[in-house]
Amino acid sequence: MVLDPFCGCGTTVHAAQKLERAWIGIDVTHLAVGLIEKRLRDAFDWVQFTTHGVPQDLAGARDMAARGRDDKNYYFEFEKWALSLIAAQPGNLGKKGADKGIDGNLYFGPKSEGRAIVSVKAGDNVGVAMIRDLRGVIEREGAGIGVFLTLTEPSKPMITEAAGAGQFDLPGFAPVPRIQIVTIAQAMELRDRAVKLPARRDDGFKRAAREEDTKSQGRLDL
């Protein structure tokens, strides 16, 4: 058994998985755990592991968000966890100051020249004004796409407002919606495939090199 109690970017658990050793990795942040999950899935086709300490279903996500309403530190961990679902890089790099409406970033394009701004909402009350705000942020920042990542299902006016932003076109690729509403439920099921990006580049979380298949099973703790 290989134990890494401060697994960070996951180098040790990656090596243990490659050597077909049983392993346990532990880290204190959801961002690190999300990074390691992605690294293992990218590198090993049939990897199996259990992650403890993160929401496993929508009820768990709602519980985590509710705790964050009373504890800002916990809220930031919810935000980082939500961003990790779609492999987005935190927009404020973990700082707790004003984020100017930018909770996360995704990059795309042949040279990673494109940028999608992510806004995370954990509250029960979401509305069309938030979609307008996100549209204003991407226009201010010169970003191509805005992603509204929400725990609560969007209303019809929100969906209509997002559709009104039109399409983003990158030469050589199919157009995608300029404003995309993605629920946490969708992100938990589809991961980074929940967001439509042309020629996506995972600059926030570099893709691990593909390793030979292994059937070993590990465990990842938070």
Descriptions of predicted regions:
Residues 1-32:
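Extended, hydrophobic alpha-helical segments in both membrane/secreted and soluble proteins
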Residues 24-222:
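Mixed-charge (Asp/Glu-Lys/Arg
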